[in-house]
Curated annotation (Swiss-Prot):
CDD domains: MobB (cd03116). This is Molybdopterin-guanine dinucleotide biosynthesis adapter protein. It comes from Escherichia coli (strain K12). NCBIfam families: mobB, PRK10751.1. It holds the Pfam family MobB. The keyword Chaperone does not apply. The keyword Cytoplasm does not apply. GTP binds at G17, T18, G19, K20, T21, D51, K52, P53, G54, S100, K101, L102, D103. Keywords: GTP-binding, Molybdenum cofactor biosynthesis, Nucleotide-binding. One of its GO terms (biological process) is Mo-molybdopterin cofactor biosynthetic process. GTP-binding protein that is not required for the biosynthesis of Mo-molybdopterin guanine dinucleotide (Mo-MGD) cofactor, and not necessary for the formation of active molybdoenzymes using this form of molybdenum cofactor. May act as an adapter protein to achieve the efficient biosynthesis and utilization of MGD. Displays a weak intrinsic GTPase activity. Is also able to bind the nucleotides ATP, TTP and GDP, but with lower affinity than GTP. Homodimer. Interacts with MobA, MogA and MoeA in vivo.
Length: 175
């Protein structure tokens, strides 16, 4: 696979319902506007399928193909069957990406991975600030309320400010 140089991985970690996907849907265009080419790895606890029953690719995969690539002029997707394997680790998944097309890999979830992360907190989402896990990998907390923390505190509703923070963090990673 082309472009196997290491690029920064930055996770966004939070409890379900905090708005990780909602935030990333706004942050990704803001990063693109700054000339950053982001990739994304999203963790899900649910059984998922990017293919549809009845489609040829779905039927061929269900017939026993261990890996299937579905390709069109606009995009392609690789599906790998892993029912008997332990959960894949994030570094393996990142190694599957063509980093020659990326400047940054954003990660939704994988909160226990030892990579840089921004933890999200929303008041009224069912948790208390005291429950936040701030370890050595947390570079900031994005919140909608003031918090007294030993890491950077960002406004979760200020997408432009978050994008600026991410760009500055990336520049520090690149020396």
């Amino acid at each position: 696979m082309a472009g196997k140089t290491m690029i920064p991985l930055l996770a966004f970690a939070a409890w379900s319902g905090t708005g990780k996907t909602t935030l990333l849907k706004k942050l990704i265009p803001a990063l693109c506007a700054r000339g950053i080419r982001p990739g994304l790895i999203k963790h899900t606890h649910h059984d998922m399928d990017v293919d549809k029953p009845g489609k040829d690719s779905y039927e061929l995969r269900k017939a026993g193909a261990a890996q299937t690539i579905v390709a069109s002029q606009q995009r392609w997707a690789l599906m790998t069957e892993t029912p008997d394997e332990e959960e894949l680790d994030l570094q393996f998944l990142a190694s599957r990406m063509d980093t020659s097309k990326l400047d940054l890999i954003l990660v939704e979830g994988f909160k226990h991975e030892e990579i840089a992360k921004i933890v999200l907190f929303r008041d009224g989402a069912g948790h208390r600030p005291e429950e936040l896990v701030i370890d050595r990998h947390v570079i900031a907390v994005a919140s909608d309320v003031p918090l007294n923390l030993d890491v950077a505190l960002l406004d979760i509703n200020d997408v432009e400010g978050l994008a600026d923070f991410v760009v500055e963090w990336m520049q520090k990673q690149n020396g």
